[in-house]
Every structure is written in structure tokens, then in C-alpha cells.
């Protein structure tokens, strides 16, 4: 009965083949985030910003400024000079930083953080900032290895008498035959390599490669000459390797300095019970010492001088940078002058505000107003920055953004409803207008309509208040709260 029930959803094709639908666990759903539509800065070849390109609408001057910044980044001429994005909330500062990361590509490290992330009870604030700096600095290691690659045609271990035992025998060496399109070669390998071959479960007909320096063995797959050997087999078939059996391969590995820090900050303890228990009890985050980082920097410098590695400065994006305090700003000033410094992009939506960490004058812990500065940043850090201002979106730009988000989210909407959402975005904020999109699609679907109408948007406007209307409601109830 269970078999009949499970096959009820199967589809019978005209050819007579029964196809089963894929299980739900294998179906991939693409999540739609706030900035899913951003694919780049949307610049022309001459560096001018197009009105609507690569998912970006508006912010012409800011995009052109970031385009110049991008040219300096790619030319390696912009270290130590951070970029500061300032503007009201909801004007696309985070979207600009993400577009910059899209333009740089996946090979360039991009580390995004929020200013409030530095406050932790386990790790110092400067340590959190330092680890983010190291995450944004990549190291491209190029290594040339000599390997033997081919299809296994012979695998013969040779035994010899064990001198330590009167009866047992040991493996003295192993004969391995490898075949490629160009020729064959027979290798005589050490017994330790035979152990690696056994761990990989290599048999005749498998395609393997053996590193000449380390003796490491890697099974690539089964030769496609044996593909018709079985009707059903959970095996990956690969073609016969081309070229000679003995060849040189250039391997490129991309790591960050933070990866090297973590690999060296966690030494492997002993295998006794006390070491194991100590590793289990020890919790929290590992703090990397400055001494260890200096040693790693020396090794990295040596690799760069030898031509083995190449330094790839990435981008560190600190959103809500006004949430940092004076200690963090002092650390930032020093870190920006370091020769191993990434490109730093800051963002703030504050005007003249108090610098965090300056509210106390130090006299018996008494509070003071603190130091007020533009964007909540010290003047010495502001002097280092190149500042880019973002503008509020116009009604036409809000309308085009709403239309684009409807296409991304797959929501059918009428032109009148788009105009209504554009009015709401101009009156309150762009975020409020975009937040009404998905609920409006659900409301219209529940009503059995094919597209979102003006009535659906008005209904949601009554259900969900924007920030301005909510503040107005609170002001109207102040007298009531004072009386009771």
C-alpha cells in the first residue's frame, strides 16, 4: 500500500518512462533579500552613471564617485584613505557598498560589519576590529607541484620478510602503473604511499594523481572506459588524463590573513584525557596576540619577496560607524597607516552628534555632554576620509525602484498601485513603501485578484503605520499619559 501511495504523484511520460518529482529537500529556493537586485554600480565605459543599470536607480553623483574610487582600488593607489558615505537613512549607502563589492568580484575579499559588533564580553573591541581588518586582506599563494597523474593499470605490492618478526611479512615497495593519452609509466613507490593508496581505496581502473614532494595520493574518479561495466553504480567517471604521466601543476589558493591567524592561534593539544577535557571546557572566541600576527606578517613578507604569494587588499565596510567609540577610532587611525591595510569604506546617517566614549569627563565618573562632531566621528579621522553624500530619492526614482522590486519578487501590480506606493515612499520613506509590497501581494492573492490594486495598498496603510504616523499617535497620547 505504501508503494502505491508513494507512486501516486509520479508522472507517466508518453514514452512509458515514469518520472518521480524531486524530494522537497533537494529543491532550492532563492531567498530574496533587500539588495538582491543590486548587481553593480551601473556605470558606462567612460565612468558616468546610467540612470538605471545593474539594479541601481538614482544616486548619480555617489555612483560616479565610487566608480573613481573603484579605479583607484584596482590600480592599488588608494591604501590608507577611507571613503565615508553620509546621508539620511534609506538613501542607499549599504547598497553602494554592496555594489562596490560586486564590481570587485569574488576573488577580492569583502568584509562587512556594523559598528556595534565590536562590543563583546569575551574579546576586546580593538581585537574585533583587528580581525575584521585581517579578514579584508587576501593572500594569493601560487605553488607549482610535480605530480604523477593517470589511470591505474597495475597495482602490485611487493612483500619482504619482516626482520623484527620471524613469521610476518611487510610491504617493501609497491609497483603502480599509470596511463594517460600520451603514454604509460611504471612507478616504484614507498610503503608509506601504499598506505595512502589503501585509504583512498584505489583499484585498477581509477584515475589518481600522486604529489612527488609529499607522496599524497588523491583519487579523482573512475576512468570512463569502465562506464558500461555496470548498469547502476554510484561512481563518478572522469576522462583519461591528457599529456604525460609526470607533469607540473600550478595551484592557486586564496586565503585571508585572518585564516592564517586562526590556523596558528589554535595549536593542537595532546591526546591525553586532560588535554581533551581542557579543549571541551574552554569556550568563547580565540584572541590572537600581536606577537603572533607580527610573526605571520614576517612569513607573508618573505613569501611575497620570493614571488610565492601575492597580497590582495580587499574592502572593509563598516556600517553605522558612529557607533564606535574613541578607543576604536584611535585604533582605526593607526591601522589605516599600516602597510598591510585594506581599503576601508565607512557609512553614517548622523549629522552633528556626540562621539561615543566622550560622555564622561573623568571626575568621579560624572557625566558630561561629550564632544560633538560631524557624523559622530573625530576630526582627525574625518580629515583622512573622502566623503561622498547620498541624496534623498525623488518620487520618480521611488516609482522605478518599486517597479524593479516587483519584478524581483514576482508580484503583479497595477500602475495605479505603483503610483500609490511611490506617494507613500515620498511621504514617509522608501523602506516603508518596499515593505508593503510582499503583504500587498498576499492580500491580493487571498482576495483572488490577479494583481495588486490601490485598495490593497490603502488597506495595508491602515494596518501598518509608518514612523511619522506612529510618532504622531504617540504625541496625541502624551496628555493622556500625564493625567493617569
Curated annotation (Swiss-Prot):
Task: Indicate, by first and last residue, each region the UniProt record lists as having compositional bias (Low complexity).
Answer: 1-11
What is the species listed in this Swiss-Prot or TrEMBL entry? Cryptococcus neoformans var. neoformans serotype D (strain JEC21 / ATCC MYA-565)
The molecular function terms of the Gene Ontology recorded here are:
3'-5' DNA helicase activity; 5'-3' DNA helicase activity; ATP binding; ATP hydrolysis activity; DNA helicase activity
Query: Which reaction is the catalytic activity of this chain?
Result: ATP + H2O = ADP + phosphate + H(+)
**Gene3D superfamilies membership:** 1.10.8.60, P-loop containing nucleotide triphosphate hydrolases, RuvB-like helicase, domain II
Query: Where in the cell does this protein reside?
Result: Nucleus
Membership in a protein family: Belongs to the RuvB family.
Recorded superkingdom: Eukaryota
Location of region: Disordered: 1-27
E.C. number(s) listed in UniProt: 3.6.4.12
Assigned keywords, A-Z: Activator, ATP-binding, Chromatin regulator, DNA damage, DNA repair, Helicase, Hydrolase, Nucleotide-binding, Nucleus, Transcription, Transcription regulation
Q: Where does ATP bind?
A: 87-94
Q: What is the documented function of this protein?
A: DNA helicase which participates in several chromatin remodeling complexes, including the SWR1 and the INO80 complexes. The SWR1 complex mediates the ATP-dependent exchange of histone H2A for the H2A variant HZT1 leading to transcriptional regulation of selected genes by chromatin remodeling. The INO80 complex remodels chromatin by shifting nucleosomes and is involved in DNA repair. Also involved in pre-rRNA processing.
UniProt xrefs under SMART domains: AAA (SM00382)
Q: Encoded by which gene?
A: RVB1
Q: Which SUPFAM superfamilies match?
A: P-loop containing nucleoside triphosphate hydrolases
Q: How does it assemble?
A: May form heterododecamers with RVB2. Component of the SWR1 chromatin remodeling complex, the INO80 chromatin remodeling complex, and of the R2TP complex.
What is the protein's given name?
RuvB-like helicase 1
Amino acid at each position: 500500500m505504501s508503494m502505491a501511495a508513494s507512486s501516486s504523484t509520479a508522472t507517466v511520460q508518453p514514452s512509458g518512462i515514469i518520472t518521480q518529482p524531486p524530494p522537497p529537500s533537494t529543491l532550492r529556493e532563492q531567498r530574496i533579500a533587500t539588495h538582491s537586485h543590486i548587481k553593480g554600480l551601473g556605470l558606462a565605459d567612460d565612468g558616468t552613471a546610467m540612470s538605471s543599470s545593474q539594479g541601481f536607480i538614482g544616486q548619480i553623483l555617489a555612483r560616479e564617485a565610487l566608480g573613481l574610487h573603484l579605479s583607484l582600488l584596482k590600480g592599488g593607489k588608494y591604501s590608507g584613505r577611507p571613503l565615508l558615505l553620509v546621508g539620511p537613512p534609506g538613501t542607499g549607502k549599504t547598497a553602494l557598498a554592496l555594489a562596490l563589492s560586486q564590481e570587485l568580484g569574488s576573488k577580492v575579499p569583502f568584509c562587512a560589519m556594523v559598528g556595534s559588533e565590536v562590543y563583546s564580553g569575551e574579546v576586546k573591541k580593538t581585537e574585533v576590529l583587528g580581525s575584521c581588518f585581517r579578514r579584508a586582506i587576501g593572500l594569493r599563494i601560487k605553488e607549482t607541484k610535480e605530480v604523477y597523474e593517470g589511470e591505474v593499470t597495475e597495482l602490485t605490492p611487493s612483500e619482504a620478510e619482516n626482520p623484527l618478526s620471524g613469521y610476518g611479512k611487510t610491504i617493501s615497495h609497491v609497483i603502480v602503473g599509470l596511463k594517460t593519452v600520451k603514454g604509460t609509466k611504471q612507478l616504484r613507490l614507498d610503503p608509506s604511499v601504499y598506505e595512502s593508496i589503501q585509504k583512498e581505496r584505489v583499484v585498477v581502473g581509477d584515475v589518481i594523481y600522486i604529489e612527488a614532494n609529499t607522496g599524497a595520493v588523491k583519487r579523482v574518479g573512475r576512468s570512463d572506459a569502465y562506464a558500461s561495466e555496470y548498469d547502476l553504480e554510484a561512481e563518478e567517471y572522469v576522462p583519461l588524463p591528457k599529456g604525460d604521466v609526470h607533469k607540473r601543476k600550478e595551484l592557486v589558493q586564496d586565503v585571508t590573513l585572518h585564516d592564517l591567524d586562526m590556523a596558528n592561534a589554535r595549536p593542537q593539544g595532546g591526546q591525553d584525557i586532560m588535554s581533551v577535557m581542557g579543549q571541551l571546557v574552554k569556550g568563547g572566541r580565540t584572541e590572537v596576540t600581536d606577537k603572533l600576527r607580527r610573526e605571520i606578517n614576517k612569513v607573508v613578507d618573505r613569501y611575497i619577496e620570493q614571488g610565492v604569494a601575492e597580497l590582495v587588499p580587499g574592502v572593509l565596510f563598516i556600517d553605522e560607524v558612529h557607533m564606535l567609540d574613541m578607543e576604536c577610532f584611535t585604533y582605526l587611525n593607526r591601522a589605516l597607516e599600516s602597510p598591510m591595510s585594506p581599503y576601508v569604506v565607512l557609512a553614517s546617517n548622523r549629522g552633528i552628534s556626540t562621539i561615543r566614549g566622550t560622555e564622561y569627563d573623568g571626575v568621579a565618573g560624572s557625566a558630561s555632554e561629550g564632544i560633538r562632531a560631524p557624523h559622530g566621528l573625530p576630526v582627525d579621522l574625518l580629515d583622512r576620509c573622502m566623503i561622498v553624500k547620498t541624496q534623498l530619492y525623488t518620487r520618480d526614482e521611488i516609482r522605478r525602484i518599486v517597479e524593479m522590486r516587483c519584478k524581483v519578487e514576482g508580484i503583479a501590480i497595477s500602475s495605479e498601485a505603483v503610483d500609490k506606493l511611490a506617494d507613500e515612499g515620498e511621504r514617509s520613506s522608501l523602506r516603508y513603501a518596499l515593505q508593503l509590497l510582499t503583504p500587498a501581494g498576499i492580500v491580493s492573492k487571498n482576495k483572488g485578484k490577479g494583481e495588486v490594486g490601490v485598495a490593497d495598498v490603502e488597506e495595508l496603510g491602515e494596518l501598518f503605520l509608518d514612523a511619522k504616523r506612529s510618532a504622531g499617535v504617540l504625541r496625541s497620547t502624551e496628555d493622556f499619559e500625564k493625567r493617569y
